[in-house]
UniProtKB/Swiss-Prot annotation:
Gene3D superfamilies: Metal-dependent hydrolases (3.20.20.140), Urease, subunit C, domain 1 (2.30.40.10). This is Adenine deaminase. GO terms for biological process: adenine catabolic process. Keywords: Hydrolase, Manganese. The keyword Chloroplast does not apply.
Amino acid sequence: MNNSINHKFHHISRAEYQELLAVSRGDAVADYIIDNVSILDLINGGEISGPIVIKGRYIAGVGAEYTDAPALQRIDARGATAVPGFIDAHLHIESSMMTPVTFETATLPRGLTTVICDPHEIVNVMGEAGFAWFARCAEQARQNQYLQVSSCVPALEGCDVNGASFTLEQMLAWRDHPQVTGLAEMMDYPGVISGQNALLDKLDAFRHLTLDGHCPGLGGKELNAYIAAGIENCHESYQLEEGRRKLQLGMSLMIREGSAARNLNALAPLINEFNSPQCMLCTDDRNPWEIAHEGHIDALIRRLIEQHNVPLHVAYRVASWSTARHFGLNHLGLLAPGKQADIVLLSDARKVTVQQVLVKGEPIDAQTLQAEESARLAQSAPPYGNTIARQPVSASDFALQFTPGKRYRVIDVIHNELITHSRSSVYSENGFDRDDVCFIAVLERYGQRLAPACGLLGGFGLNEGALAATVSHDSHNIVVIGRSAEEMALAVNQVIQDGGGLCVVRNGQVQSHLPLPIAGLMSTDTAQSLAEQIDALKAAARECGPLPDEPFIQMAFLSLPVIPALKLTSQGLFDGEKFAFTTLEVTE
């Protein structure tokens, strides 16, 4: 755990210090004083009564001794509870299908003042240009948008076709950027464990910052070796004992609750007073519909309190202070003198009802964020341009030949989990022996002109129609699932025509589609408009059968080879446990 102050992220001039100290001593006027407020004590538990005094971006003082202190403006909290701004320890903003600017508009009023983002989705499509755009967005954001430098582009060398490389030389050019906190998730954990020099070079280059991990289900000597390499955290744990063992071995545990991967119920029982400094909250991938209707990190805090009886100060601790300490952001995470004034006022701390948000010492107005969104997006110079270098397809491109009596591998989906199982199914003249089997294909979209990689999918719940998308981790090729080759082709051709996006086909017609013009990953629409369009997509998808709660997000992970057990990339079926390609027909 990175507990040292990283001065890279704590810029305060001598003049600012003098002004701050003068207000702390009571010799100068504060910019803001928040009155009629109780402060949740994340260190000792309980509450601290008294005002919060703000000068510039920082907290100058806390407590009853400032009751009569002068201020340019006073904020009446009306009995609210004040907590530090929430921090998401690991996410890919692109997976929300929002730009970083729109994401800020949607989440900052909910108390999410800081995010630790890995932009490897857009980097896989556009390379360094995608990372540079995220850095521009972070520089102009009110929200603290920090970046981890994407470490595995593509996720696993030689297993998929992606749009660009991101070399160590390019990575190093961003290491000292003021918004960069470290190295993003090192997904090639077998390569790290085996000591591949190219991966160790990346770890060595960023060792003075934070090194993110990714090791679902890993244990035994392999987990020890992975941690020994310097990996500091993991957000992929999905079993209680797995999470406990990682904590025992010194790893910090990111408890994830996204739109597809939902691990909070499994891991929340681990959180206690002792280990909470080693526990953090993250979303990884969360769509705008869920953000609008359920919330973001605020939703996770609410569930910890209401469903898992986590004490208030511990729930808010893992949502702020623990993450700030882990990433060396010691100017964040507490409401204390000298800390950045990222403050969430709650009218109900148990229900996480946000009354007002301040970031860097300034109150946030949601309407102002919305009004400025278009201009701020334009200022960031988004990397527009069609990234779909694929000609339209026909039904014959998805033709598979099966022999009666033969057994074939099936990717078996687990609803609301990223892992899959590998099972087999016997084909007869009447079809497969399980009626849940449908077809899946991945088509590379970067001009390599490869034939579609085709396979079988079970457990997804698709009874009719087809779904297609260019959001397909991590290489973001076109993924399509369907019951008929004709409808699969129709869905794929719609997303090609849109320049990237999502599509639902049923009864031989496009029922709903969502263009994603930035890298085939993100929309330029407002968060509200995007949420409405996703609602329409989900409604259309539900007509195709009892699908996962978030069918497109779940589908997006069916081609990610670094999560077991069986996946399909543009190169073919991949065994995520043996880390090797395998055949559709079972011949063993």
